[in-house]
């Protein structure tokens, strides 16, 4: 089941357990702490991790350009909101599963600790 976020993904799992049903393959979004634990326990199948450090780095790069009186770095794409073309600085989301969680969170001691304990 594709869920719009991790909270609902965990609610699906809880509901299935409560009804005595098998847990289906459940995907979430946001890489919430409880869902990382659930993935590691073999319940939730996956979540989508958004690379926050990359997002912050891109934001700082844009702000630094503005502080220097420069234009924002060129965006690879844009979307018209009905008024203007809004630049899009897309970062690749990362699908996290039990099979790759350790690798994905290897540089994140807080998240890695969730897998160890």
Q: Which stretches of residues belong to each language-model region?
A:
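Sec-exported extracytoplasmic/periplasmic mature domains
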Residues: 13-21, 40-44, 61-68
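Hydrophobic alpha-helical
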Residues: 1-38
């Amino acid at each position: 089941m594709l869920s719009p976020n991790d909270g609902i993904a965990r609610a699906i799992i809880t509901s299935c357990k409560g009804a005595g049903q098998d847990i289906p393959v459940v995907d979430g979004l946001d890489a919430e702490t409880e869902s990382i634990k659930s993935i590691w326990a073999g319940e939730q199948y996956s979540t989508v991790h958004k690379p926050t450090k990359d997002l912050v780095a891109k934001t700082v790069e844009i702000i630094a350009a503005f502080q220097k009186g420069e234009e924002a770095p060129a965006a690879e794409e844009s979307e018209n909101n009905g008024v203007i073309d809004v630049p899009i600085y897309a970062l690749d989301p990362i699908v996290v599963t039990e099979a790759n969680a350790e690798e994905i969170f290897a540089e994140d001691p807080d998240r890695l600790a969730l897998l160890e304990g």
